[in-house]
Amino acid sequence: MLVLTLATISTLAVSPQNAQAQKEAFEVVSVKLIVPGSGPGRPGMFMNAGPGCSLTGVQVDPRRVAVAAPLFTLIATAHGGNCRVPDMIIGGTDWMKTDRWDIEAVMPEGSPTYTPAQFVGGNAPKINAMLQTLLADRFKVAVHRETREVTVNVLTVGKGSPKLAAANDADQPARRINARKDQEGKPFLEFIAGKATMATLAEMLQLATSRPVVDRTGISGNFNIRFEYDNDGIARPTVFTALQEELGLRLESAKEKMEVLVIDRAEKPSDN
């Protein structure tokens, strides 16, 4: 089962970066509104992190790109945002999270080859640039970035010494949060960060807490991290308790000024 994985935006009309991104475009594009209850849809890789934040039927093979998603998720994917951290994307209307769109597109000859996992994880820059162009053309999407004060979680060392297992050179990086069930069928989540820095841990904790996380541990090095948690604290401790008990780290709420993505405009396209 695919679970949560990791994923520069300025005003589209003026930014040099976005001007460059506008030059990147798919050769062929099909955009269709998905009718609710119309069936299971296209098979493929998926990511589901709650209402308005999902990608399904993801295929990249090798020039053809296909995905089904709400516009909110498509904007976040195209512009390097994170739909799993709501405070970091401002604006938009309800239909952008509820209506789902099926998109099929063909990249130009000579485009880089990506895997579905790279696209879902935000590591397919050429596809993202072409998706920016598609969204601007078909959905009339315009966005910009600005600095706002938002609620964050600050990662610090708890009471006593941190309990972290240092990674070896031979260890492999790993970044995943797996959905599991215990012997009684109660669901919980398995957090795995292999050969990870504290900055990487902070990035992954954004997915677990749906808030920006700022690393203030002062700890350097790579570590193998694994713990189990439950958002409701029933089958397992909450992520906050698990961090303290298993790793000797704390998450504390605070206000910080951070750069956020602001959605200025979007329209529903016509089917083609």
Indicate where each model-derived feature is located.
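Beta-strand-rich assembly/attachment modules of structural machines
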Residues: 1-272
